[in-house]
């Protein structure tokens, strides 16, 4: 079923459950979160993983949208409900809504989960922020970047009609719940950090009066005023206020009060002119100078637009003028308070196309969101690069307008320089698979039309070259081969077009290191490269959510869809799950410690055919399990990993202590890298919803995960590492 189904269900589900203008019922987010955290009632989850968001949403949707009260929701009823919501939300009476306006309308009626920001009402951040861009993208039939009542109605009608497999004229609660659980990825805020997907808003073309392709100070000022007027006209509150903090329980980070950092100048810090930009043994200092003092507010206003804020970058005494800066990230932006550290993207070639530092032209500076150890990204990168091409990573100190903003992760861009270093050529097609609420970028075959693939895969290389070389057609063919080729001939069919062993290493790392933002759970957040010979390669992208418990919802149906008692995460289908029910291992479930993630979880998840299809081939499954065993035996051995962690601790501990804008405490860092810590939870004991996720030290995770994998029956039978 096309991507539309998931987003429209989110649309209807949020409307029905959360008392929007469409419905008018009361909703307490903490009650629903508590229900989700407890898992399904005994006996509810059927084979194949019946537990999921639909279990809670569907009955309310049917009850509230069922106009004729026949116990079913028909396509017509769904369409009328969706159209009414868009019509009521169109405060500016423009006849349609863009994503920002739709998101704010949802947020005005949808209470944020506890801990997502200040107590006062706000429409600038909430579940609608995550849902709206994907809804508009999916339902926008005329591709004008907006959703009209008519488009909403047609999309909602199509979802219900397509999901009505028995052609009964509509869906009852059970049918709707089943369709939702089959088609929905993690619901916003539950299934792993994500964020508002959709396309960025294009402002440069409208405000670039001098035609130089970028906005100067006066042009940016005009654009900001226009943005504020648009939001006010559509019922918004302008630029968001004091910001939104992370939800409580995400690791007990002990966030410290923010205050200004020390003043630093180039003469106060060491320079490393002979060291690479990604040398792991140093902490280089980057100086950014913005022309305006309200640079943070300005970048917040331009978030999710095509506007770069210009600055001067100084590295090792070298002045690099005309760089462009914007905030990057989704949950790492939207759940971080203003004044605290947010991730940055710096384009060195913003004005001067030839400007680089050490051969690199893009900097990705990460705020270590949800990682009190600060080490997840650098460790994942170091381990992954042992087995396949992956971005390099190290640490830098960032000084903005003379004030230290502390320690950032510095992660290599997936660009031509990356290709040259890892594949010996700058040629070929590159795609980014961005995280999205639907988590549907896993190479599922969606037919021969290009549109659905362009929605899921963001081409980062030349469009002209992609057309000339047939790269999009080749990507569609890869998806088709995965989908339609029998297991006994799949390896031979894939070998000319996919680096199969590289894909198996990619999947093994994803699972062995429990990447909560990984392919296995989100079907997104990775990169794809097609080399000049026509072979595809998979490259890790988002690495900060590894080395810990899985997020609440992962692939439906657990391992092989065995349902209750399936080997996804311990007895009962979930870690410590109730007898007689359980999701069969939905991404580890809310109480999973993460160390018990089954290496064969989610093989029936249609969103992730690389796992389901490749591992259905006995020889490839055996090779994958051998790779998992290699990672467990070698890379997770604390005799190997411990000295690396200790080296980084010695390098950055003083930096973290001095960091006044960090998202976690010094004590949390010290606990994360401690050699002496509470042991990892015993098998089946779980870690408690939320907080246990980040209370496990790196050593406890490595020891526990290694032990679990090497004792796993399937892994034990795999060939040992060479």
Question: Where are these predicted regions, by residue range?
Answer:
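Short capping micro-motif at the N-terminus of alpha-helices
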Residues: 76, 100, 150, 174, ...
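Bacterial N-terminal signal peptides
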Residues: 9-21
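Short, highly charged
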Residues: 69-75, 79-87, 95, 143-149, ...
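Phosphate/dinucleotide-binding and metal-coordinating scaffold of catalytic cores
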Residues: 2-7, 21-47, 108-121, 181-205, ...
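EF-hand Ca2+-binding helix-loop-helix modules
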Residues: 39-64, 75-76, 80-84, 103-138, ...
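Acidic carboxylate motifs that coordinate Ca2+ or other divalent cations, activating on Asp/Glu
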Residues: 66-70, 92-94, 140-144, 166-168, ...
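A broad, structural micro-motif
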Residues: 73, 97, 147, 171, ...
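EF-hand and EF-hand-like Ca2+-sensor regions
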Residues: 88, 94-115, 156-158, 162, ...
């Amino acid at each position: 079923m096309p991507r539309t189904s998931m987003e429209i269900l989110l649309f209807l589900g949020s409307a029905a459950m959360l008392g929007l203008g469409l419905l008018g019922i009361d909703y307490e987010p903490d009650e629903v979160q508590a229900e989700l955290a407890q898992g399904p009632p005994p006996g509810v989850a059927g084979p194949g993983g019946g537990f999921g968001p639909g279990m809670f949403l569907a009955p309310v949707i049917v009850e509230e949208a069922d106009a004729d009260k026949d116990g079913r929701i028909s396509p017509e009823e769904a369409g009328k409900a969706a159209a009414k919501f868009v019509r009521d939300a169109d405060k500016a009476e423009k006849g349609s809504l863009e994503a920002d306006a739709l998101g704010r309308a949802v947020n005005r009626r949808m209470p944020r989960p506890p801990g997502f920001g200040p107590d006062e009402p706000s429409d600038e951040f909430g579940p609608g922020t995550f849902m709206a861009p994907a809804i508009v993208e999916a339902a926008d039939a005329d591709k004008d970047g907006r959703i009209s009542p008519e488009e909403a109605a047609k999309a909602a009608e199509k979802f219900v009609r397509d999901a009505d497999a028995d052609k009964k004229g509509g869906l009852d609660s059970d049918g709707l719940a089943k369709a939702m659980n089959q088609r929905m990825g993690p619901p916003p805020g539950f299934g792993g950090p994500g964020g508002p997907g959709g396309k960025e808003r294009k402002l440069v073309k409208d405000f670039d009066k001098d035609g130089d392709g970028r906005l100067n100070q006066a042009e940016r000022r005009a654009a900001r005023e226009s943005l504020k007027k648009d939001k006010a006209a559509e019922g918004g509150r302008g630029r968001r206020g004091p910001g939104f903090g992370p939800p409580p329980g995400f690791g007990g980070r002990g966030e410290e009060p923010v205050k200004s950092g020390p003043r630093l100048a180039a003469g106060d810090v060491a320079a490393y002119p002979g060291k690479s930009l990604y040398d792991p043994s140093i902490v280089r200092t980057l100086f950014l100078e913005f022309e305006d003092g309200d640079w943070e507010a300005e970048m917040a206003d331009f978030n999710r637009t095509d506007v770069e804020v210009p600055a001067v970058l100084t590295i090792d005494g070298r002045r690099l003028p005309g760089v462009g800066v914007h905030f990057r990230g989704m949950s790492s932006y939207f759940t971080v308070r203003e004044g605290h550290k947010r991730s940055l993207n710096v384009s060195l070639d913003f004005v001067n196309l030839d400007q680089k530092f050490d051969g690199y032209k893009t900097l990705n500076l990460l705020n270590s969101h949800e990682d009190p150890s600060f080490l997840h990204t650098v460790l994942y990168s170091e381990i992954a690069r042992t087995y396949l091409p992956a971005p390099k990573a190290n640490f830098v100190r960032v000084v903005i307008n003379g004030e230290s903003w502390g320690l950032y992760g510095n992660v290599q861009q997936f660009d031509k320089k990356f290709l040259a270093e890892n594949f010996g050529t700058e040629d070929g097609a590159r795609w980014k698979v961005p995280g999205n609420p639907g988590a549907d970028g896993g190479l599922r075959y969606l037919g021969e039309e290009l549109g659905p693939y362009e929605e899921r895969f963001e081409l980062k290389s030349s469009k002209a070259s992609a057309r000339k070389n047939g790269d999009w057609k080749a990507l569609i063919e890869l998806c088709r081969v995965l989908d339609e080729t029998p297991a006994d001939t799949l390896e031979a069919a894939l070998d000319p077009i996919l680096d199969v062993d590289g894909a198996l290493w990619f999947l093994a790392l994803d699972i062995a290191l429990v990447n909560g933002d990984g392919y296995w759970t989100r079907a997104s957040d990775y990169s794809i490269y097609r080399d000049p010979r026509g072979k595809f390669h998979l490259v890790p992208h988002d690495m900060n959510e590894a080395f810990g418990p899985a997020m609440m919802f992962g692939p439906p149906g657990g391992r092989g869809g065995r349902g209750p008692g399936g080997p996804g995460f311990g007895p009962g289908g979930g870690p410590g799950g109730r007898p007689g029910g359980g999701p069969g291992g939905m991404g580890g479930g809310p109480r999973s410690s993460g160390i018990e993630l089954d290496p064969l979880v989610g093989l029936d998840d249609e969103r992730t055919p690389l796992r389901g299809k490749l591992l259905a081939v006995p020889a490839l499954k055996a090779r994958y399990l051998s790779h998992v065993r290699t990672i467990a035996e070698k890379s997770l051995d604390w005799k190997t990993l411990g000295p690396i962690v200790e080296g980084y601790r010695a390098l950055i501990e003083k930096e973290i202590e001095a960091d006044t804008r960090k998202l976690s405490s010094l004590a949390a860092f010290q606990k994360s890298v401690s050699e002496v810590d509470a042991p990892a939870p015993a098998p089946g004991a779980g870690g408690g919803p939320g907080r246990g996720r980040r209370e496990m030290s790196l050593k406890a995770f490595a020891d526990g995960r290694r032990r679990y994998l090497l004792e796993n029956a399937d892994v034990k039978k795999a060939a040992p590492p060479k």
